[in-house]
Amino acid sequence: MGRGKIEIKRIENANSRQVTFSKRRSGLLKKARELSVLCDAEVAVIVFSKSGKLFEYSSTGMKQTLSRYGNHQSSSASKAEEDCAEVDILKDQLSKLQEKHLQLQGKGLNPLTFKELQSLEQQLYHALITVRERKERLLTNQLEESRLKEQRAELENETLRRQVQELRSFLPSFTHYVPSYIKCFAIDPKNALINHDSKCSLQNTDSDTTLQLGLPGEAHDRRTNEGERESPSSDSVTTNTSSETAERGDQSSLANSPPEAKRQRFSV
């Protein structure tokens, strides 16, 4: 069975406390010796008992170890002092930089002398020149980039135009032309043979058909009466009909004749 966990507290029994001290002291010195041998470390152990008895162990010598320990402590203290001094210097520099920053912004100028103000003015002037030069360089670079982009765009447009021209050369050209089997002759409306009114008049005189409603006897009597009424003007009707027939013949001959014959006839 394993050893039980021992509660870490002061042992009240003096005999038990002395026995435990002797065992733990021997173990501690043994562990220190092993540590110095195994790890090549400089180890020193100092133990005082309840009664004031001294027990010690040192791998290289107690005085040498204690001297080294003292030097280390003094160096640590001096290093701490150096660190504190460096912190103070950095704080002072930070405050000066903050004050300088405010002065560059035009604030806190009252404590400055005339020479300090002149120096500040020179600093601002040189800073302004540097800013302007940097600004001009940036604008020049942007202008150059814009020109390069413009040249690229022009080259792309030229390439696209050439491609379009090449495509048009491959496609047939469509032109509006009049077929050879259609012939058109321009005629002046003033010299037209038949106008709209004459056409209507001819169409109206093509037929003479009437429709009469009534009983057979009444229709026969009406026809007889109408024949007697129209008999006196038969000669005039015949004359009008013959004149209209002659006009129709002349118009048909003119319509079928070539344009040169039409012009000659109109000129005569």
UniProtKB/Swiss-Prot annotation:
* Keywords per UniProt: Activator, Cytoplasm, Developmental protein, DNA-binding, Flowering, Nucleus, Repressor, Transcription, Transcription regulation
- What does the entry state regarding organ or tissue expression? Expressed at low levels in flowers and siliques. Also present in seedlings. Detected during embryogenesis and accumulates during early seed development (at protein level). Expressed in shoot apices and the base of leaf petioles.
UniProt xrefs under SMART domains:
MADS (SM00432)
Function in brief: Transcription factor involved in the negative regulation of flowering, probably through the photoperiodic pathway. Acts both as an activator and as a repressor of transcription. Binds DNA in a sequence-specific manner in large CArG motif 5'-CC (A/T)8 GG-3'. Participates probably in the regulation of programs active during the early stages of embryo development. Prevents premature perianth senescence and abscission, fruits development and seed desiccation. Stimulates the expression of at least DTA4, LEC2, FUS3, ABI3, AT4G38680/CSP2 and GRP2B/CSP4.
In the UniProt record, does the keyword Iron occur?
no
Q: Where is the composition biased (Polar residues)?
A: 233-244
Q: Where in the cell is it found?
A: Nucleus; Cytoplasm
Q: What is this protein called?
A: Agamous-like MADS-box protein AGL15
Q: Which PROSITE patterns match?
A: K_BOX, MADS_BOX_1, MADS_BOX_2
What follows loss of this gene?
Early flowering under short-days conditions (SD) when combined with AGL18 disruption. Decreased ability to produce somatic embryos in vitro.
Chief location: nucleus
